[in-house]
């Protein structure tokens, strides 16, 4: 009851007391001035330092992003150049292979023509030799035939014997 009597005498908790309001305001201003002198500067400087740190981090992040994009562009350019270079190398390789194939085909064709010409020359020489041998044999046969004709008379039986003899001689010379 004592507490309720004090509350009733002072006018209650919700009724304003001008002295209390004054001293509360004075105390608040004094605490505010003390905080401003002692704590406000360090708090503001800490906030400013934190803001600078955050801004620096943001700037570094943008810088890193820009650098990464530049590296990405450079890598893409290098990849495109490498693709072009590989296409050029492949194209040159194909061209070289085709040129080499063509040169080899031309060389083989030249060698074949050379071999054919050599074979034709050899055949022609063999043909000449065979004709020479044949001429010699025909001349020998003609001479032998003429000798036999001169030595014997020319009746039908004699002629037949001479021809048969010449054929046998020719056959024996060939073997």
Curated annotation (Swiss-Prot):
One of its GO terms (molecular function) is proton-transporting ATPase activity, rotational mechanism. One of its GO terms (cellular component) is proton-transporting ATP synthase complex. Pfam families: ATP-synt_B. SUPFAM superfamilies: F1F0 ATP synthase subunit B, membrane domain (SSF81573). It is a single-pass membrane protein. Keywords: ATP synthesis, Cell inner membrane, Cell membrane, CF(0), Hydrogen ion transport, Ion transport, Membrane, Transmembrane, Transmembrane helix, Transport. It is found in: Cell inner membrane. The chain crosses the membrane at residues 20-40. The keyword Transport applies. Its main location: membrane. Belongs to the ATPase B chain family. F-type ATPases have 2 components, F(1) - the catalytic core - and F(0) - the membrane proton channel. F(1) has five subunits: alpha(3), beta(3), gamma(1), delta(1), epsilon(1). F(0) has four main subunits: a(1), b(2) and c(10-14). The alpha and beta chains form an alternating ring which encloses part of the gamma chain. F(1) is attached to F(0) by a central stalk formed by the gamma and epsilon chains, while a peripheral stalk is formed by the delta and b chains. F(1)F(0) ATP synthase produces ATP from ADP in the presence of a proton or sodium gradient. F-type ATPases consist of two structural domains, F(1) containing the extramembraneous catalytic core and F(0) containing the membrane proton channel, linked together by a central stalk and a peripheral stalk. During catalysis, ATP synthesis in the catalytic domain of F(1) is coupled via a rotary mechanism of the central stalk subunits to proton translocation. This is ATP synthase subunit b. It comes from Chlorobium limicola (strain DSM 245 / NBRC 103803 / 6330).
